[in-house]
Amino acid sequence: MGYNYVSLIVTILLVVITSPVVFGNDAAPIPENKGRIEQWFNTNVKQNGRGHFKTITEAINSVRAGNTRRVIIKIGPGVYKEKVTIDRSKPFITLYGHPNAMPVLTFDGTAAQYGTVDSATLIVLSDYFMAVNIILKNSAPMPDGKRKGAQALSMRISGNKAAFYNCKFYGYQDTICDDTGNHFFKDCYIEGTFDFIFGSGRSLYLGTQLNVVGDGIRVITAHAGKSAAEKSGYSFVHCKVTGTGTGIYLGRSWMSHPKVVYAYTDMSSVVNPSGWQENREAGRDKTVFYGEYKCTGTGSHKEKRVKYTQDIDDIEAKYFISLGYIQGSSWLLPPPSF
């Protein structure tokens, strides 16, 4: 499949910030009423605070190592076929696209070529990264069970304190490596087939659609927690599970201590009645933490759930449904507006 190359300007804006913090409320829970989310977010996330390039890579390369200023890279509409890495020495970078003409960053890297986690179209190693109105794709073909190393990531986020607003992620197996650090996803769309959100991150997904494609066994999360003391896990709040088939699992125990919670989430009939894939390793039914809280939809019915599903109560839920889960009030900024 060919690509239309669009020669468009990538613009850099420098925003001087004296401190990468915001003053919000870590304890305020996300409201159960979906219509009140924006009011909650705007109340609890408050902002304190040229050059022209033809590729995203050129723009990122122009940012000096050890940067201490928020750099906003405005990306024009079009398809950018690039494999982009943001080094850990370049924090405070924002990739910004127009919401009505979202740029597409795409590449076809696979595990066979690069190794699984390095196959990503976008690799972020730096802290304080932000992406707004960006489409990230891995255009490699869907794994067919025959080709070795067919996993293909759209993104790997390994930096701490990263935020994604109105972004779309397309892939099949291993779409997002939510690797390490605190992360926030809001109003995003994530598509995949198997383990398409995996890693050891500590992340809050708010108002995000999880769309599963293809037939056969499908699994959304493979959280890689390795001990009860590890401070990592995925919390999905006011999200939506959609897709095809009826074999979708909310998660599986890739490692010994996964921690995944779905709250106020709409689960369609595509979710397998058991909810979570049965553990293949002995004893993992005692070490996993799979929680569900006030979810809705045909796929949320509890009658046939695996016995180790946690039906968490109001007190337990507060831990997972506030910015405190990712310590967000100390670093989270709203998206820039132009």
Curated annotation (Swiss-Prot):
Listed Pfam families: Pectinesterase
Entry GO terms, CC: extracellular region
UniProt entry tagged with the keyword Coiled coil: no
Documented EC number(s): 3.1.1.11
An example molecular function term from Gene Ontology annotations: pectinesterase activity
Catalysed transformations (reactions): [(1->4)-alpha-D-galacturonosyl methyl ester](n) + n H2O = [(1->4)-alpha-D-galacturonosyl](n) + n methanol + n H(+)
Marked site: Transition state stabilizer: 173
Gene3D superfamilies xrefs: Single-stranded right-handed beta-helix, Pectin lyase-like (2.160.20.10)
Residues the entry annotates as binding substrate: 116, 151, 252
Leader sequence residues: 1-24
Cited InterPro entries: Pectin_lyas_fold, Pectin_lyase_fold/virulence, Pectinesterase_cat
Entry keywords, A to Z: Aspartyl esterase, Cell wall, Cell wall biogenesis/degradation, Hydrolase, Secreted, Signal
GO BP annotations, alphabetical order: cell wall modification; pectin catabolic process
Subcellular localization(s) per the UniProt record: Secreted, Cell wall
Active site location: 174, 195
Domain of life: Eukaryota
Pathways involved: Glycan metabolism; pectin degradation; 2-dehydro-3-deoxy-D-gluconate from pectin: step 1/5
Stated family: Belongs to the pectinesterase family.
Chain's role: Acts in the modification of cell walls via demethylesterification of cell wall pectin.
Protein name: Putative pectinesterase 63
